[in-house]
């Protein structure tokens, strides 16, 4: 299951990718209209804190939408949403490991990956969505090193 965060009609929502389609299930709307679950998290962060139970809740909502006579109403085409980063804002700093593979260390000017682990943090505001414009801050730096390697595995 690939969970996505997005904005539609100025509302931040989340849901899983629709299999074999360029669309996402609006699980927030499914729960709102079909009232499948007794309790459902309001944000993706709240859901992630539930662990595997959250994955099961999302599966139940998608199953209910697929069985509903007008279940297609809960699918939103990618062209109708504004992408957000998978986790729009983390509650704490993000721990990172720098130069953790040889090719990256070499492209940064080293001969090989360092022997000792290189840990640093990123602010919650450092997260950007796919295709988002990144601020350059030319008054502070003349180059950026950006990578897209954020993942959460539940289960």
Q: Where would I find each of the regions flagged by the language model?
A:
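N-terminal non-catalytic cap/leader segment that marks the start of a structured domain
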Residues: 1-113
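Glycine-enriched loop-and-adjacent helix/strand subsegments that border the catalytic/binding cleft
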Residues: 91-155
């Amino acid at each position: 299951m690939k969970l996505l965060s997005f904005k539609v009609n100025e509302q931040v929502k989340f849901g899983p990718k629709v299999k074999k389609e360029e669309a996402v299930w609006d699980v927030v709307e499914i729960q709102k209209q079909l009232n499948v679950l007794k309790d459902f998290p309001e944000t993706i962060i709240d859901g992630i804190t539930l662990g595997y139970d959250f994955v099961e809740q999302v599966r139940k909502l998608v199953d209910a939408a697929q069985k509903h006579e007008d279940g297609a109403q809960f699918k939103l085409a990618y062209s109708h949403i504004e992408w957000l980063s998978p986790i729009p804002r983390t509650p704490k700093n993000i721990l990172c490991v720098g130069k953790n593979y040889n090719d990256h260390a070499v492209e940064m000017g080293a001969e090989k990956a360092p022997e000792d682990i290189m840990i640093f943090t990123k602010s919650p505001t450092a997260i950007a969505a796919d295709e988002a414009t990144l601020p350059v801050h030319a008054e502070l730096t003349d180059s950026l090193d950006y990578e897209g390697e954020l993942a959460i595995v539940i289960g």
